[in-house]
Amino acid sequence: MSAEFEIAVEREFPATPEQVWQAVTAETSAWLFPPEAMTGEELVFEAPTHHVNRMEGTDGWFNQLEQVIEPRPNGRSFMRWVHSGVFPGDPAEGEDQEDGIRQHTVFYLHTLAEYLEHFAGRPVVFADVQGPETSMAADGFEVLRAALGVAADAPVGAAASATVAGLDGAIVDYNTANFIGLRTDAALYRFFGRNAFGGPVGMTVHDFAGADPEQLAVTLQEWLTGLYT
């Protein structure tokens, strides 16, 4: 058994349609994940307005991303992002999975806006690390939140107080129950409370200052793991 879903999120961006198109189709390491993770077929590739990527599997499974981009005054753009597909497994769990995907999508598109406003076009180094199994506990994200020095009610623009290398001078750019975004002059740090969705706490970094990718991943993994041991 399985359940289909469709999640649509709309927002404006501080960039032209051409810049948004480039970010969505070629610069995903700067705000989402590396483009090689997008292994589906390009069903539509109409620059700079319409893009559809689709993966298909057995028993009717599919995962599809669609972006429709429109110009707005003053060099801005509007994008409608639609993520559709099929949840494997128990359909009764589909509602929770859909909520998790929606929350992730809103956070990712916020990160896209941050990239376009502060780092557009700059080379990026991407790192993705996951907490240990112990981070899946009910208070897993609260442990991370305390280590970052970001209270649940901290407003956008508030200072963080994390001690991990690279986070000096970080400010909050996003803060919800399950997600935190921090921005420095050199990078975007994204923190995911996936313990709320049955997974470990995780983090990604989009570094725009030429960090060594291997050392960056090692440093962050040691820090994150250390919070739960």
What role is predicted for each listed range?
Residues M1-A37, Q97-A151:
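Hydrophobic ligand-binding cavity/cleft-lining segments
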Residues V124-A186:
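Acidic, Ser/Thr-rich low-complexity intrinsically disordered segments
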Residues T16, T25-T28, T39, T49, ...:
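Residue-identity detector for threonine
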Residues A37, R54-G57, R72, A146, ...:
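Generic detector of intrinsically disordered, low-complexity, polar/charged segments
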Residues E6-G89:
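Ordered, small/hydrophobic-rich secondary-structure cores
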Residues E36-E46, I69-P71, D153, D168-Y174, ...:
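Short, exposed beta-strand/loop patches in secreted or surface proteins that constitute
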Residues H118-F119, G157, G198:
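Glycine-centered secondary-structure boundary/capping sites
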Residues R54-Q103, P123, D173-T229:
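Beta-strand/loop substructures that line and gate deep hydrophobic ligand-binding cavities in soluble
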